[in-house]
Amino acid sequence: MSSLIKEIEEAWQIKGQLLQDSSKLIMLKKTLNDVIASLNQGAIRVCEKKENSWEVNEWVKKAILLYFITTESQLYNNNYNSWYDKVAPKFSVDTDENIFKEAAIRKVPGAVVRTGTYIAKNVVIMPSFINIGAYIDEGTMIDTWATIGSCAQIGKHCHISGGTGIGGVLEPLQAKPVIIEDNCFIGARSEIAEGVIVEEGAVISMGVFIGSSTKIIYRDTGEIIYGRIPAYSVVVPGVLPAKEAGKPGLYCAVIIKQVDKTTRSKVSINDLLR
């Protein structure tokens, strides 16, 4: 792995000159294809949890960006659509049926998954878009018209509801993508962006918009936090009243309750939100 990282880092330093050196370009393309294949298999990932902290593997981001620089667009076709892109689809009309059967993946018409994306076992992909570098763990549902941004990390047994936007990020290199940990529910038409971390077991109601500067308020105490939804929190949209009379209030996300793991597993999402 160290030699692979070294090669990517060296190529990154001369990225503006790569297209002018055909011999280096040929060697680099093979390396980049290996990185994309490893992303597809989940052998490497853009961001991973180490000792309770999420860390970005910047070299993987660099490899993806180099892949864009060194790859020419081409025409792709399937049975009902065609498109012109630098990134191939993860699944094509030639994909062996056994790949889906062995992994128990269900992918319906209209679902777009770019290569360089990891899709684990028992994932259901409705008509949606999943970008390069994303990681979708076991048993998760990506519902209709959801968008999973580049490098976004989605945990096990999550439900990403219809029309939801999960932000991704390739640049700046050190920035974290959005991270949705295990057993989370993200309500329909919500948007989680700008590197926000939704910790394990959290429930986000329909229509909640959270970015890095969004005020996240504990309803009981009034405490305000940013960029993180604590584990097993239940969150709804709200408005923070203006301090001055007659001034408009500002949007916020409100933590209305926190439950333990046992309660979360036994109580329905609808009951939690009520």
Swiss-Prot record:
**What keywords does the record list, in alphabetical order?**
Acyltransferase, Amino-acid biosynthesis, Cytoplasm, Diaminopimelate biosynthesis, Lysine biosynthesis, Repeat, Transferase
Q: Reaction(s) catalyzed by this protein?
A: (S)-2,3,4,5-tetrahydrodipicolinate + succinyl-CoA + H2O = (S)-2-succinylamino-6-oxoheptanedioate + CoA
Q: What class of enzyme is it?
A: transferase
Give GO terms for biological process: diaminopimelate biosynthetic process; lysine biosynthetic process via diaminopimelate
Its localization reads: Cytoplasm
Annotated substrate binding lies at R106, D143
**Would you identify the family this protein belongs to, as annotated?**
Belongs to the transferase hexapeptide repeat family.
Q: What is this protein called?
A: 2,3,4,5-tetrahydropyridine-2,6-dicarboxylate N-succinyltransferase
